[in-house]
Amino acid sequence: VLWSREDDMAHDFYRPASYHRISGAVDAQGQIAAWKHRSTSTSIASWWDRAKPAESQELGSTLQMPYLMKNYKLEYAPADSGVPRAWWRSVEASFIGFVMESYMDELAHAAGADPLEFRLRHLDPARAVANAVDPKDSNPLVCARMRGVLQLVASKAGWGSKLPAGQGRGIACHYSFNSYAANVADVIVENGKLRVERIVSAVDIGTVVSPDGARAQVESAVIYGLTAALKSQITIQNGRAVETNFNHFACLKMDETPHIEVHFVPNDLAPTGIGEPGLPPVAPAVMNAVFAATGKRVRRLPLLPDDLRA
């Protein structure tokens, strides 16, 4: 049986939706005093097995918080939906990375701190965080390695240099699939229109077995992440998907693709994942750059055409 693209997009599985509400505070010393994260999402696990409760995977790296803070509270409630759903590149990290790193940026500005310095301030190089999602996983999140990708990407991107009016630079990092990734995004916002000029990525995946293949994976993750953040949206009306082809469900085109730089942290540790970890920091780096350029916070994806015109 040969399906048309319209048939395929109308009857395929879709990326889960999620909603997050975060509140927090910083103290007089500029340290995070509290972080409360409430979220709900349409569970992948419960779609495939209705008798199975939403798995802890939906919480992802919220259960493996890299940033040191005095009080951290996490609440989750599964949301039911009749929309068929399944895995998408980087799974729950694709939206959790956006949420966590966007809010980390908001806390940095609330503290009057540089976003890079604020992140480093809360990453204790002597600290390792066990995997609460999978107790059998012997690979903890090593904060020193997260610091390493942040420092490398900042150095390569020229973090701290002054930009002209209407331009912004944002930073974000995330840990997934036992790998560490950080992005710096440079954007231009003019007359309510956004153009991403450059993405610099730094990744720590242990020993890089195939440099060309690994670099291609990160570059494609950037393009995937930008497509999802800036264009991809499925809307459901009368029980069916409205968008059924690429004229309505657009992908990032070649002339819209920014200059992409990829850098790897050199080490001789065991190789870890590379196909997905490059994606989660893309959207928050871009939207943090949008804030730097415009003073407007983007808290919903994808970014719609009118979001920056208001």
Set out the residue ranges of the language-model regions.
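Cofactor-binding beta-sheet edge motifs in enzyme active sites
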Residues: 1-310
